[in-house]
Amino acid sequence: MPIRHCIVHLIDKKPDGSPAVLHARDSELAASDAIENLLADLNDSYNAKQGKAWGFFHGESGAYPLSGWLKQYLDEEKDFTAFSRVAVEHLQKLMEESNLSTGGHILFAHYQQGMTEYLAIALLHHSEGVAVNAQLDVTPSRHLDLGQLHLAARINLSEWKNNQNSRQYISFIKGKNGKKVSDYFRDFIGCQEGVDGPGETRTLLKAFSDFVESEDLPEESAREKTQTLVEYATTQTKLGEPVTLEELSSLIDEDRPKAFYDHIRNKDYGLSPEIPADKRTLNQFRRFTGRAEGLSISFEAHLLGDKVEYDEAAGTLIIKGLPTTLVDQLKRRKD
C-alpha cells in the first residue's frame, strides 16, 4: 500500500466547552514500517466498522471549504502539509462550536490501494495499558486505540476525479451517540449522504430472494447461491470495496453469468451498478434449514418475525405468503 503523504496533528480539547488548542506538525511523517503498519491497521479497523454512510461533497463554500483545499492540493497549488494545516485549523473551529466534542490526534494520509488513490482522515485516541520492559518490569504504556475508531472518513480520490456523477466517493463513520456528537465531523468533511447503504443492501437481498423464487431452485442450490452472495459481499466490506452487480451475478451462476444481473435490470429495482454493502444487514440474511421425516424447511433469517413466526413453547412455525407453486400443488391435492 504505497503511502504518498502522511501527517498527524493534535487538537487538545475536553468535552466541557473549553477552548480547543491546536498543536500542528510542520512537516510530513517520514516513510517507515511503523507508518505502514498504522495505515494497514487503520484500514482494517475502518473497513470492519458497521454503520458507515456514503456520500459526496457539498458544493464548495465557506461552510464546506475542505473540497476546495483538497482540489488545490491535488492540482499542486498547495503541498500536503499546507493542505492538512488549513484543514485541521477548520476542524479546530468546528470542535469549539461543538461542546460535546473531544480532541485527539488527527491523521491525514494520502495513499494508494491497487489502482485507486484515497485520502483518509481520522480522529485517533490513546488507551492506557501496561507493558513489560527490557528489565522485566511492568510499566505503563500508551498506544493508539484503533478499536475505538468513532470519527473517520475516507475519500476515493480516483472516483471523485474521474466520475463527476458519483454520489458515493466518500465514506464516513456515523456517530452512535447522537447528532450533536458527530455532525461537526461530517460538516468538516463537507459530505452529504448520497447512498443509503443498509437500504441498498436490503434491496439487493430482496432482488436475490425474488430471483431464487423465480428460478424455482432446489433447496441445496438456493443455499449455495445465498452463501456465495453473503461471502462475496462480506469480503467486499472487509476490503472497503463496493459490491459490483455484474461480478456478483457471475459468481452466483457461472453457467449463466448475466442471469441475476438481467433479473435486477428487467425488474427495475433501482440499484446502482456498484453498491456499498452494509455488514449488519448482510448478517441478517443467513438461511435457516432443517429436515425431518419427509419435511424440508429452508428460509432466510431476515424473514423470521415477518413471514415466518416461531412459537418456541409450542414448537411450531407459522409461514405466511406461501410460494404460489406450493399453493397450486396443495389446491390440486385438495381437488
Curated annotation (Swiss-Prot):
Gene Ontology CC annotations of this record: bacterial nucleoid; cytoplasm
Keyword tags: Cytoplasm
Family to which the UniProt record says this protein belongs: Belongs to the YejK family.
Annotated NCBIfam families: PRK00378.1
Record-given protein name: Nucleoid-associated protein PP_0973
GO molecular function, one term: double-stranded DNA binding
Highest taxon of source: Bacteria
One Pfam match: NA37
